[in-house]
Amino acid sequence: MPLGDCNISTPDNKQNRKNQEIRVPRVRVIGSDGEMVGVLSRDEALAKAEEEGLDLVEIQPQADPPVCKIMDFGKFKFEQQKKANEAKKKTKQVEIKELKFRPVTDEGDYQIKLRNMRRFLEEGDKVKVNIRFRGREMSHQELGREMAARIEADLGDDIVIESRPRLEGRQMVMMIAPKKKV
């Protein structure tokens, strides 16, 4: 982008000043080819950038004198945006998966739910275990506590219990998270 382009005020523009936005009298200049040009006055550096048809972009404002590079500002912003998008893609949102049990859940169903729970934890998600009581089962809450203890024992040391089993209305709730890998 040549020097005559207008500056659009965005939060990103505040990070890297360019051309006339640079206010310091002397800057260390890196050429468009990546070679060190040296310490020049701001006006000399701007003239050199204009001569090449590029922008003078402040790369390290905290340095003494600040480091500026002669480059195409639009291309520079595009590359920064691309890097930010790549970093954003690599981060994974932790989801909370919910599995519902009953105090009298059959062995086959229990094993399937346990296998799913292991898979969710391996993927890095948290699991909310919900043990529901129906009718007179509420008078046998110890069965729910035994079920929660069995789940904890079957999953082994690969987990962190974020919240111990607690009664919420007619259901017992427990939160399980995967253990952080070092």
From Swiss-Prot:
GO molecular function, one term: translation initiation factor activity
Bilayer-spanning residue ranges: none
Localisation: Cytoplasm
Highest taxon listed in the record's lineage: Bacteria
Any one GO cellular component localisation term in the record: membrane
Keywords on record: Cytoplasm, Initiation factor, Protein biosynthesis
GO biological process terms held by the UniProt record: ribosome disassembly
Gene3D superfamilies: Translation initiation factor 3 (IF-3), C-terminal domain (3.30.110.10), Translation initiation factor 3 (IF-3), N-terminal domain (3.10.20.80)
InterPro entries, per the entry: T_IF-3_C_sf, T_IF-3_N_sf, Translation_initiation_fac3_CS, Translation_initiation_fac_3, Translation_initiation_fac_3_C, Translation_initiation_fac_3_N
Annotated region described as Disordered, given as residue ranges: 1-22
Pfam families the record matches: IF3_C, IF3_N
Main location: cytoplasm
Quaternary assembly: Monomer.
Function: IF-3 binds to the 30S ribosomal subunit and shifts the equilibrium between 70S ribosomes and their 50S and 30S subunits in favor of the free subunits, thus enhancing the availability of 30S subunits on which protein synthesis initiation begins.
Family: Belongs to the IF-3 family.
Full protein name: Translation initiation factor IF-3
Species of the source: Xanthomonas axonopodis pv. citri (strain 306)
Gene of this entry: infC
